Amino acid sequence: MASSSSSPSSRRYDVFPSFSGVDVRKTFLSHLIEALDRRSINTFMDHGIVRSCIIADALITAIREARISIVIFSENYASSTWCLNELVEIHKCYKKGEQMVIPVFYGVDPSHVRKQIGGFGDVFKKTCEDKPEDQKQRWVKALTDISNLAGEDLRNGPTEAFMVKKIANDVSNKLFPLPKGFGDFVGIEDHIKAIKSILCLESKEARIMVGIWGQSGIGKSTIGRALFSQLSSQFHHRAFITYKSTSGSDVSGMKLSWEKELLSEILGQKDIKIDHFGVVEQRLKHKKVLILLDDVDNLEFLKTLVGKAEWFGSGSRIIVITQDKQLLKAHEIDLVYEVELPSQGLALKMISQYAFGKDSPPDDFKELAFEVAELVGSLPLGLSVLGSSLKGRDKDEWVKMMPRLRNDSDDKIEETLRVGYDRLNKKNRELFKCIACFFNGFKVSNVKELLEDDVGLTMLADKSLIRITPDGDIEMHNLLEKLGREIDRAKSKGNPAKRQFLTNFEDIQEVVTEKTGTETVLGIRVPPTVLFSTRPLLVINEESFKGMRNLQYLEIGHWSEIGLWSEIGLWSKIDLPQGLVYLPLKLKLLKWNYCPLKSLPSTFKAEYLVNLIMKYSKLEKLWEGTLPLGSLKKMDLGCSNNLKEIPDLSLAINLEELNLSKCESLVTLPSSIQNAIKLRTLYCSGVLLIDLKSLEGMCNLEYLSVDWSSMEGTQGLIYLPRKLKRLWWDYCPVKRLPSNFKAEYLVELRMENSDLEKLWDGTQPLGSLKEMYLHGSKYLKEIPDLSLAINLERLYLFGCESLVTLPSSIQNATKLINLDMRDCKKLESFPTDLNLESLEYLNLTGCPNLRNFPAIKMGCSYFEILQDRNEIEVEDCFWNKNLPAGLDYLDCLMRCMPCEFRPEYLTFLDVSGCKHEKLWEGIQSLGSLKRMDLSESENLTEIPDLSKATNLKRLYLNGCKSLVTLPSTIGNLHRLVRLEMKECTGLELLPTDVNLSSLIILDLSGCSSLRTFPLISTRIECLYLENTAIEEVPCCIEDLTRLSVLLMYCCQRLKNISPNIFRLTSLMVADFTDCRGVIKALSDATVVATMEDHVSCVPLSENIEYTCERFWDELYERNSRSIFSYKDEDGDVYWVNWDLMMMLMLI
């Protein structure tokens, strides 16, 4: 497609179509013109012009006054001298660079048009009869040049409607390109494309309002300006208005002023007078307008200017840019485009554009550029400001500037970001600071409890000052976080003791060590610094917190909560030389992992305490007596190995979560736990003795974990809370669950390695159950009735050695995805006629007594049976029609697959080791198949017709000793990357009329009957032919231009090696060791010792199973300094080797 930039404003037409009326006027062309018209694209039509042999002057003028010509080549196009003369004129404009041209091929082959052959060529030759030679040459030149341009071949599109829309969008993008000045904003085209889709510009009747929403500095206004510039030519009446906050009590005057500004802009009348409301609606009711309102923060501004879409004419578009999502909701703007932060890759491109004027930074700047992008959190404003400030500086200057960039905010960035903060009310400003200084990354539910705020968080999220993730976490952009902390720091005037929040280690150390804290301090969060230093992290005196009477949030050691740190003595990082005698009474959050104290101060009353988190501590007990714990909602003392007792919980009536897991010294739970009637989560795995009678009052308990725990008493388990959603009890000592337990809320049951013999009697209401883990329960004889387990997705029973069968009710588990029954030694049979269409994984490995496997309807991506081949019967009706989407079926006695085998959904077929003579008759639909493994199928005499396996990437036929050749249908495997046929000793030849365009690896090693050098792909990179009967390396080996590795050692029959092998510039290794029959090889050739720097890539499977130890291990030893690996988008692993030596080894 031509890329002319010539588009003078004097052009009358956007598009000139050249076409054969008899072919397309009433069909394709009419639809295309309608689509262009919907996009406000002015298309010339030849109504009223009488066609003749001589092109009319009106048409010549129209062609010259069009910005784009669309030439529709069809069957009869070349039959018209009129069309051909039009084409000549279009060709002239194109060659002068005055016009863009888009060729469209409607039912004709582009090459036929280009070469004037085929049916199109026959028609053209007939038209050329009796025509002057110079005229014919002009036609030929025009046809050849125009058809060579990038265009659209309608034969390749899914539907004609799709292609019409595609062409119309292409024309629109070329007519209305991205304006100059926005090129540095990498990715802006994608934003504009998405917004234009929402605007539905092809609809001429609709009046549409769209919101563009996102945080400050993310590029909303830039995107809006670029979009406005691109759309402006399609709207005669248009206006771009930026909201400016005003103060004053004259609300009416302010509204009239807004209306005047909009109308003056849109009508082009500077002296317009407005003395009453509603003039916007009156003046613009019948006008098609484009209005963009930027930086809107006032609902009245919207109501005044764009109160309703009906105020404007058909086809109008209103775009509102704001940081406040609630404002859009209030104005009932439902179509909202959220501008999200760019990806890391895009951010790096942006910083590179601003700093270096190109898409990627120089190699020695990459790390620095990446750090700058991280410092500004990929915020486009930050990328622009810092990138521009670093432009033209050398690396040393970048390095010198980094400390300042890490610690200080740029004034321009801070000024922009502060606008959103300044617009908040006083209460929400405080909330903003709390999150910036302390609660960034916390759960929303947790912050609501600690700050006693609900509405404010929603407000901050709507104003893009925080983001609430789908998992319920609060995320604040790091530049906003830095802004909030700077605001708190500024109020203290350099005195850390007067700040509300202390998060800097040096500030905390000064305040805590010197005991200078004041009542201003609300929160202290000790950062995880100096973890591995020899000196203590923090020295805390016995009364360090005494002056901080209003301290509510104390977090010490919020580093990773894994047990590793206890191994290296993290407790020593906090030094309490006199212990601790005081903790502020108003504490709501006390998080002190690895606390070295044996107990908390006796003066601490915990009246306001909401969260107590002290994992991996040295606590032996928390406190003496009963404390007023009415506010406490979470207590987490997990992995506190010295903890011998937990306090009286009589007054902890609001406690919702209690974690005592792995408290190895804790023997039992106190009876007072029954008072925690709101307890929803109880983790006490490893607590030695549990009286589960204490659970009887916990009617709200949903999550119970008692792994490794014994049960008090000998009467068995008599009660489990009814509302349990998750029960985790590995190594459970009971024989069955209580008969009165109703599992209607149960989502996950995990009782691995238990002593269970059965779960319960009868049928339970298991509609909520999704996961059941009973593996390793060697006494389990039966699993319960699953009739009502309609949502069960995972059932793990492997190692259940006493299990004999599955209940027929499993057929009701139609959503079952995973069924694992490995090593069920006594399993004898499955229920008949199973319908498990959702099943993706079925494993029956190690089930030696399973003697029949009846019909099963499922959709597997993995299926494995690995038992003794003499102990399984498989009937011809083994598979129903809707077979697994993937199949791994080993050691089967069938001579061929069942006649009803339908593998259309199959992605991975592994029947290695089977006794098949052939897989199936005829052609199967294998469009989904990506990998096929028939290895070690010694009876296999032919592989199936693979004509339709167009997506197959890997084919393994190793050890198929009865295979003599491959069918020519493998030529359809255009995506095949690897073909392995090692030790196919019966293989004599491969097809010679195929070229597998994607094949990189071909392994025929050990094919001792193969006499002919394989030439089935010109893209081969690795060719393994050792121990074959090949007699000659032919001269056409030079066609294998990508060949990097050729192994042919021990080819005893090899007699001739063509010198053309030296023309292979990519060849790095050629091994002809022990080829004793060579009579003409390289006797007069000079061995190449080294080659220029280059890269060779050999793809390996995800499991690195094709390691080719005989070669790669040797290379690695020699080149280990320069080998690295990576995975491509399909998961293929690549070894990349630099500076490899070429080895030509002969004896």
From Swiss-Prot:
Function as written in the Swiss-Prot or TrEMBL entry: TIR-NB-LRR receptor-like protein that confers resistance to the pathogen Hyaloperonospora arabidopsis isolates Emoy2 and Emwa1 (downy mildew disease). Plays a role in the regulation of temperature response during plant growth and survival.
The reactions it catalyses are: NAD(+) + H2O = ADP-D-ribose + nicotinamide + H(+)
Listed PROSITE patterns? TIR (PS50104)
Q: Which SUPFAM superfamilies match?
A: L domain-like, P-loop containing nucleoside triphosphate hydrolases, Toll/Interleukin receptor TIR domain, Winged helix' DNA-binding domain
Question: One matching Pfam family, short form?
Answer: LRR_3
The signal peptide stretch is: none
**The name this protein goes by in its record:** Disease resistance protein RPP4
Q: Which residues form the NB-ARC domain?
A: 189-446
The catalytic site is made up of 86
UniProt cross-references to InterPro entries, sorted A to Z = Apaf_helical (IPR042197), Disease_R_plants (IPR044974), Leu-rich_rpt_3 (IPR011713), LRR_dom_sf (IPR032675), NB-ARC (IPR002182), P-loop_NTPase (IPR027417), TIR_dom (IPR000157), Toll_tir_struct_dom_sf (IPR035897)
